Design a protein with these regions (language model features):
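Bacterial N-terminal signal peptides that target proteins for export
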Residues: 1-9
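Residue-level detector of alpha-helix boundary/anchor positions
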Residues: 10-13, 27
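Alpha-helical transmembrane segments and their juxtamembrane interfaces
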Residues: 13-14, 46
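C-terminal segment of classical bacterial N-terminal signal peptides
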Residues: 14-22
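Serine/threonine-biased, Pro/acidic-interspersed low-complexity stretches characteristic
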Residues: 21-31, 130, 134-137
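Long, low-complexity serine/threonine/glycine- and acidic-rich segments characteristic of extracellular
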Residues: 40, 46-54, 58, 64-143
Length: 143
């Protein structure tokens, strides 16, 4: 009897742990993408970047409650050759622009030259979703 109870409790705790681990997991069809500018666009600064998302939601950083499990907020990665560590909060610097208010567009002041842009969705604590929602990297030229 005790062995069955321990086994049952272990299974329940494992199921709850798996459910919590998946709480911030977007569905497999979810994606983030840059609407504009287009890849290889020639633009002037400030650059208007419009972002889209399918299969998941957008919410401001720090959102609490159930909504935080079904949404995140955008981060624009600028001129990065490598993605940030997916197990740590997304850095906050000139190459990692946080859209804390849940914005889906932003004006970026970029110097003339070639630049790369990519999106990474973060949760309420600025950590990437698991699995991470990352857009394709685009390249633009600022005149």
């Amino acid at each position: 009897m005790t062995k069955k109870l321990v086994t049952g409790m272990s299974a329940l705790l494992l199921a709850v742990g798996v459910q919590l681990a998946q709480a911030h997991s977007p569905p497999g069809e979810a994606r983030v993408f840059i609407i504009e500018p287009s890849d290889d666009a020639v633009v002037t600064s400030p650059v208007l970047v419009k972002m889209g998302i399918d299969g998941f939601g957008i919410t401001p950083a720090g959102t609490k409650g159930k909504r935080r499990h079904t949404a995140g907020h955008h981060h624009v990665l600028i001129d990065l050759e490598e993605l940030p560590d997916m197990n740590e909060p997304i850095p906050r610097d000139a190459n990692h622009v946080h859209l804390d208010g849940g914005e889906t567009e932003v004006l970026l002041e970029l110097l003339p030259g070639e630049h790369s842009l990519q999106l990474l969705l973060g949760d309420e604590d600025h950590e990437p979703q698991a699995p991470a929602l990352i857009s394709q990297r685009i390249r633009i030229t600022v005149q």
